[in-house]
């Protein structure tokens, strides 16, 4: 049952926020939308509505499966009301152009049959945040249900990169100009957004006390390198690196893969780890690794990769594919699949100083900019259209 936001004793009503995402706020693995939601919960009543979950999710090993027993009920977690919407099936990208009419119909039906809980939460919201992906299908619904709500689109990823269905791409092109804010994690995403005046660059943030976390070191004596996350994970990197650098211990955290038979004894593989626990492994490493399996990664990852941001924050030299080196001095690029370039990049990282070159905002400052980027001129990607000077009538002009 939905509970309307209550006014505090002061009589000033706290704002009400709603986040729509294919993530769930309660999962151990955290993305940027989780940290933004943390900040929203400090500012007002906050709800998190989780989409794209059904019986099909079992086939893909969805990370929300441990929450299945709580589906279709409101659960309070760390000050946020959470709702995991489980349907019998959910729409998906069939990757078959001849099935596009069926695919479109699936998405339209899904968006047209929301649960009452979502409708109630939309009506009560002052601000609705849509994360890139399937949440796009519900923007039009939000506009109809609550025309007064501020609509914010958080582009955590480019839609073409995460292989959303054509319906979602076309729908976003249609509704983009009507949104109040489109907040991109990288300027490189702007080219595929069919709007300009409401488009801003707001990168990821870091925990305000991140530099105070992660002590003591989890490592024994010696040289240690760390890789965190599963995105496009390339085990072959560690097959090469572990043999070429036996003096380095490589720590692989949350790759989503087991131990590769080609790994040396100096590779330690960990399963999923809570975000706070990974900080020590990053903070005390000699260098960090972003082992993406291909150069065919989106250019915006140079700015948007959470692991690279955390390496940058701690001044860690980072080894990553050439495509995501970007303008960052502390990164050393290699070509995936090319052993010589992997070895050269690691050699450079081992010799590099530990210097923080990148300015990193905390999550509070980041959330300020996501909600109201116009208050921060540096976030604007396109020049503000000039205000037309008032036109004088011909009679007024002649009188001057």
Swiss-Prot record:
What outcome follows a substitution of residue 292 to A?
14-fold decrease in catalytic efficiency. 25% of wild-type xanthan production
- InterPro entries the record matches: GumK_N
Composition bias (Polar residues) maps to: 390-400
Outcome of altering residue 192 to A?
No effect on both substrate affinity and catalytic activity
Q: Its GO biological process terms? A: polysaccharide biosynthetic process
Pfam families, A to Z: GumK_N (PF22059)
Bilayer disposition of the protein: Peripheral membrane protein
Q: Provide this UniProt record's keywords sorted from A to Z.
A: Carbohydrate metabolism, Cell inner membrane, Cell membrane, Glycosyltransferase, Membrane, Transferase
Task: List the GO molecular function terms.
Answer: glucuronosyltransferase activity
Q: Where is this region: Disordered?
A: 377-400
Q: Which SUPFAM superfamilies match?
A: UDP-Glycosyltransferase/glycogen phosphorylase
Put simply, this protein is called UDP-glucuronate:glycolipid 2-beta-glucuronosyltransferase
Q: Which organism is it from?
A: Xanthomonas campestris pv. campestris
């Amino acid at each position: 049952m939905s509970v309307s936001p209550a006014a505090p004793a002061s009589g000033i009503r706290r704002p009400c926020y709603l986040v729509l995402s294919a993530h769930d706020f309660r999962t151990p693995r955290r993305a940027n939308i989780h940290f933004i939601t943390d900040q929203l919960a400090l500012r007002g009543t906050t709800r998190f509505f989780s989409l794209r979950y059904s019986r099909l999710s079992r086939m893909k090993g969805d990370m929300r499966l441990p929450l299945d027993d709580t589906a279709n009920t409101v659960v309070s977690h760390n000050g946020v009301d959470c709702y995991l919407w489980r349907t019998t099936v959910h729409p998906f990208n069939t990757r078959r152009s001849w099935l596009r009419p069926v695919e479109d119909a699936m998405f339209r039906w899904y968006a047209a049959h929301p649960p009452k809980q979502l409708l109630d939460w939309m009506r009560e919201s002052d601000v609705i945040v849509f994360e890139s992906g399937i949440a796009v299908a519900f923007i039009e619904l939000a506009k109809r249900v609550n025309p007064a709500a501020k609509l914010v689109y958080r582009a955590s990823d480019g839609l073409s990169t995460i292989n959303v269905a054509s319906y979602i791409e076309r729908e976003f092109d249609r509704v983009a100009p009507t949104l109040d804010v489109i907040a991109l994690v990288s300027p490189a995403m702007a080219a595929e957004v069919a709007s300009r005046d409401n488009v801003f660059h707001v990168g990821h943030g870091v925990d305000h006390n991140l530099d105070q976390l992660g002590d003591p070191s989890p490592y024994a004596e010696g040289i240690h390198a760390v890789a965190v996350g599963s995105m496009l994970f390339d085990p072959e990197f560690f097959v090469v690196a572990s043999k070429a650098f036996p003096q380095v211990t490589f720590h692989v955290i949350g790759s989503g893969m087991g131990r590769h038979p080609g790994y040396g004894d100096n590779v330690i593989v960990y399963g999923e780890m809570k975000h706070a626990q990974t900080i020590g492994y990053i903070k005390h490493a000699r260098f960090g690794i972003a082992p993406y399996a291909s150069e065919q990664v989106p250019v915006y990852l140079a700015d948007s990769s959470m692991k690279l941001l955390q390496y940058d924050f701690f001044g860690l030299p980072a080894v990553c594919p050439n495509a995501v080196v970007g303008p960052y001095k502390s990164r050393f690029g290699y070509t995936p699949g090319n052993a010589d370039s992997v070895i050269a990049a690691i050699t450079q990282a081992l010799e590099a100083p530990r210097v923080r070159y990148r300015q990193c905002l905390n999550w509070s400052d980041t959330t300020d900019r996501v909600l109201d980027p116009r208050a921060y001129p540096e976030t604007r990607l396109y020049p503000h259209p000039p205000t037309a000077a008032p036109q004088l009538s011909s009679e007024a002009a002649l009188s001057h």
